[in-house]
Amino acid sequence: MGCPEVQDRPGSGYELEETPAPVPVEPCLGSRPWTLSGGLSMVLKNIKYALKNIPKERVTRLCPEVESPLSERFRGLQTLDKSKCIGCGICANTCPNSAIKIVKAPIAPGSEKKRWFPQIDIGHCLFCGLCIDQCPKGALSSGKEYCKGMVKWAHKDLLMTPEKLAREVDIQEGDER
């Protein structure tokens, strides 16, 4: 509300002597007030459109039933060779999404000795391969796993600990550096 002709200017000595009538607010260009008939016709129009376009078969699926052939350049879930990893953290510093953290983990299942290894949150990973390219010892490599290993229902399941990353290779007690 306000009156464009008369404004109260504090400190100017000018005071409003009477309260002006409120100025009506004009609707925006192209807008019209919502009415029951207009809203109902819009809802019916959308229901008609939805019923017309209900497919008889599923258009998409959560996972393909048959795995697609992969190209040589495909970058899948990373694998970690714990015997080569020195825990330097270059992979974590290189990651553009900060998806890699360096954590202390056992050198082998059941071992009490721990070292620093990468932990990758594949929910944030771009699979760009920078961590693999920058690893000075070649401890990280790109796997070919893409559907079974990455489709999860909860985000916490997308956290790839060093134990999960080192699916094939673990350090033997005598090989530790």
UniProtKB/Swiss-Prot annotation:
GO terms for cellular component: membrane. It is an enzyme of class 1 (oxidoreductase). Optimum temperature is 39 degrees Celsius. Its EC number is 1.5.98.3. Binds 2 [4Fe-4S] cluster. Residues 76-105, 116-145 form the 4Fe-4S ferredoxin-type domain. [4Fe-4S] cluster 2 binds at C95, C125, C128, C131. Signal peptide: none annotated. Residues 1-21 are annotated as: Disordered. Component of the F(420)H(2) dehydrogenase (FPO complex) which is part of the energy-conserving F(420)H(2):heterodisulfide oxidoreductase system. The membrane-bound electron transfer system of the complex plays an important role in the metabolism of methylotrophic methanogens when the organisms grow on methanol or methylamines. Catalyzes the oxidation of methanophenazine to dihydromethanophenazine. It shuttles electrons from F(420)H(2), via FAD and iron-sulfur (Fe-S) centers, to methanophenazine (an electron carrier in the membrane). The FPO complex is composed of at least 13 different subunits. This is F(420)H(2) dehydrogenase subunit I. It comes from Methanosarcina mazei (strain ATCC BAA-159 / DSM 3647 / Goe1 / Go1 / JCM 11833 / OCM 88) (Methanosarcina frisia). The lineage of its organism: Archaea, Methanobacteriati, Methanobacteriota, Stenosarchaea group, Methanomicrobia. The gene is fpoI.
